[in-house]
Amino acid sequence: MLLSVVSLVLLGAVQGSDNPGPSDVAIGPHKYNLFRWEVDHFLDKWVNKFQDILPWNSEPPRERRIAQAQEFFDLRSQIRDLERELADRNGPADIHERIDGLQRLVDDMQPDVEETIESEISSVLVEEGFSSRIGVIFPPVDTVFASSPGALIISPRDHIAQIESTLLKPGISGAVRGELEDLILREDNVSAIIVSTGGVATYPSVVSVSGSLRDALAITAHEWLHHWFFFQPVGQHFWDNADMTTINETAASIGGEIIGDRAFTAMTGEVVTREPSAEAEDPDAFDFE
């Protein structure tokens, strides 16, 4: 059931026209395959859970799982540093081998780290009263670390208002983004911008791990709140108008930071403080998350 309803939330942003024009044809190869994502990942959490309860698989202590999560993000940071060296052609001769070796390590760790992140977020949600009377969090926190899709945002030219959005494959180059934006402007007489995202509320959610442990916790909580909102009136009216979309995104952003920061403090002992925004937000500005 959850697979269908969460997919339906996003399909409003993914479906195309029955009579594709030049811009639709150009965008087509770059569209994110939401259905494929759901089929590939929907059962991952429950397969891992089943493996965990097998008698010969004992769950490591929480302290060890937290240390593994911190190591995972440290290794990810090392990979990014090496990739920058590779791009600048300033790295050592064995840089490819070093990247591959680190990547194998993080790939092996990833399922366990995802479970740790989900567990820590769930614990905070229970403390904050999101659980049922029997202590169950619904929907369960479920996330996969992956490259997050891009988003094509369409607006009228004479005022700022999101009238359409489409999820795109991650990793589209700046040159291709510019070509698509120019084509849409020329063919459809609307403004277009392609942006990157930190996560998407598929189920399980897509969460980018291009940042830190703290970032991943906040994004995971943000996307879970979208899942939870779906079963509340505020989420069921997400697509009614731009104001409702903004309300949903703002609530998920604020709540995601609070929940994520509390999970980060519980895991690391570090007290998190966030500086208040120095400028008032423009109510007509896009929120692309």
Task: Please annotate each region the language model reported.
Residues 32-37, 42, 50, 72-73, ...:
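Phenylalanine-focused residue identity feature
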Residues 78-82, 87, 91-281:
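Acidic/His-rich structured neighborhood in mature extracellular/periplasmic domains
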Residues 1-3, 283-289:
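Pan-zinc metallopeptidase signature
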Residues 1-131:
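N-terminal low-structure segments adjacent to metalloprotease catalytic domains
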